[in-house]
C-alpha cells in the first residue's frame, strides 16, 4: 500500500519519535517499506510492500539536489533552501494553526530550522554522502492556495561550471515524463506546474563564479502528494507511469 503520512518515511524509529513525538507501532513494517520519489526508485519499487510517499517540500528540493550530490558537483555545506508554498501546504486546518496571522493576505515563515520534513531530507542526503550535509531550510506560506517554489542557494565544487550542473540535470531527467529542466537563467514561478504532476527546474548563475541558484517548482497537492502517489502506484503495479496523470 501507499502511505501519504510520515509514518514510513523515517527508517529510524528513534528519529521518528524525536521529530513526530510518537512511538512507532509498526516497526516491523518499516523494513518492508521504501521512501519513494519515483524518478529515483522506479527500478526498485516493486520489491517493497509499502511505499512511503515523500513530503511536498522534500520532493521539490531533492529532485533538484540529489543528482548533483550523487555526482559530487556541489559543496555539501552552507546550502540555503528557501521554499514558498501555497497555504494548503499547512494542512486542512491551516486557519487554526495561524490564528494570529491573516494567512490569506500575508507571507508567513514557519517551522524555522525545525520543520519535520528535514528529517526525511537528512535521511536521504545521508544515504548519498554517508554523512550529514549542512543546510538551512525555511518554508514560507504565501497568500495563494497551492504550488511550491523552492529557491536553493549553493556553491559548486572547484572547476565545476554552471553548464556542467545544467547538463547533468538535463541528462538525468532526459527520459522523465514529469521533470523539465529549463534553459540556464530562466526566471520561473509555480504557474506552469499547477494542477499537474510536473516539476520544473531552473539553474541560474550569480555574480560569483562558484555559486549558483537552483529553482524547483511543483504543485504541492499533486507532485507533492496525490499525483506522486499515483505515479508510485503505476510503477509498483507495472502500469504506464503517466496513467491518470497526463
Residue ranges and their predicted role:
Residues 32, 56-63, 112-120, 164, ...:
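Conserved active-site and cofactor/substrate-binding residues in soluble primary-metabolism enzymes
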Residues 67, 168-172, 230-233:
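Short, solvent-exposed amphipathic alpha-helical segments in soluble enzyme
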Residues 76-83, 87-214:
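C-terminal substrate-binding/catalytic lobe of Rossmann-fold NAD(P)-dependent oxidoreductases
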Amino acid at each position: 500500500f501507499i502511505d501519504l503520512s510520515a509514518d514510513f518515511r523515517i527508517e529510524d524509529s528513534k528519529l521518528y519519535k524525536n521529530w513526530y513525538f510518537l512511538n512507532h507501532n509498526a516497526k516491523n513494517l518499516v523494513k518492508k517499506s521504501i521512501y519513494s520519489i519515483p524518478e529515483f526508485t522506479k527500478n526498485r519499487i516493486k520489491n517493497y510492500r509499502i511505499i512511503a510517499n515523500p513530503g511536498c517540500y522534500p520532493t521539490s528540493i531533492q529532485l533538484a539536489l540529489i543528482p548533483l550530490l550523487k555526482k559530487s558537483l556541489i559543496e555539501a555545506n552552507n546550502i540555503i533552501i528557501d521554499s514558498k508554498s501555497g497555504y494548503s501546504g499547512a494542512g486542512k486546518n491551516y486557519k487554526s494553526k495561524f490564528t494570529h496571522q491573516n494567512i490569506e493576505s500575508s507571507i508567513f515563515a514557519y517551522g524555522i530550522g525545525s520543520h519535520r520534513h528535514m528529517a526525511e531530507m537528512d535521511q536521504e542526503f545521508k544515504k548519498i554522502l554517508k554523512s550529514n550535509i549542512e543546510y538551512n531550510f525555511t518554508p514560507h506560506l504565501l497568500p495563494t492556495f497551492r504550488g511550491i517554489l523552492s529557491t536553493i542557494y549553493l556553491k559548486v565544487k572547484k572547476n565545476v561550471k554552471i553548464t556542467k550542473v545544467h547538463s547533468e540535470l538535463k541528462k538525468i531527467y532526459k527520459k522523465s515524463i514529469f521533470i523539465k529542466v529549463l534553459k540556464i537563467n530562466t526566471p520561473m514561478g509555480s504557474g506552469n506546474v499547477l494542477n499537474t504532476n510536473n516539476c520544473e527546474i531552473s539553474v541560474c548563475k550569480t555574480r560569483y563564479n562558484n555559486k549558483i541558484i537552483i529553482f524547483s517548482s511543483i504543485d504541492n497537492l499533486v507532485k507533492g502528494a496525490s499525483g506522486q502517489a499515483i505515479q508510485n502506484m503505476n510503477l509498483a503495479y507495472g502500469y504506464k507511469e503517466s496513467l491518470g496523470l497526463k
